[in-house]
Amino acid sequence: MTDLVRSSSKRERLIAAARTLFHQQGVHPTTLAEVAQRADVPPGNVYYYFKAKDDLVRAVVDDYIGQAESMLGELDRLRSPAPRLKGLTRGWLDVADTAAEHGCPVGGLCAELNRCDGALGRAGAEILGRITDWAEAQFRQLGRRDAKDLAMALLSGIQGSALLANTFHDATIMSRQARYLERWIDSLS
């Protein structure tokens, strides 16, 4: 195994561990030592990849953005905007059980980072911002002048259902909301 492959693997493990811990216990309470332990990386090696905790947080945000862009790219392969929007809604069901237990991984991170100052405070908005911009473009393709408002309503419905699923420890809230949102999308197209 080359040094580059080992480095990439350790870096990816650190990001994956941070994602999980940030979701389960929050960014601020999570220590770099906990991330290192979960990633099975010596604690001192964390600083080789990330000079500060903020750098690791930024890497987690970038990872979420990459996943979002990949998901949206897959949805763009569908033939028209309504199925794409419904696909976005259904895609969130993949995290329904997780959301019921710990809240939405993306929504929770965005809410927590929003309380930070500077670049880190703005970083969380990038994740949901990309998804909202994409949804707005889909509604525009449906000929809707209120596309921005509709995109916000869609994301509010998705994120709101994740919050309620967590509050009531009931993943079915998200699946019921997804069905409602799909009917709503049909009524708009």
Language-model-derived ranges and their functions:
Residues A59, G73-H102, A151-L154:
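Hydrophobic alpha-helical connector segments
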Residues V106, G118-R130, R140-S189:
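Hydrophobic/aromatic-rich alpha-helical bundle segments in the mid-to-C-terminal region
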Residues R11, I15, P43, V57, ...:
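Alpha-helical structural signal
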Residues T98-R122:
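Amphipathic alpha-helical segments used for helix-helix packing
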Residues T2, R13, A17-D55, A59:
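Helix-turn-helix
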Residues M1-S9:
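N-terminal intrinsically disordered/low-complexity leader segments
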Residues D62-A68:
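Short, basic, alpha-helical segments at the C-terminal edge of helix-turn-helix-like DNA-binding modules
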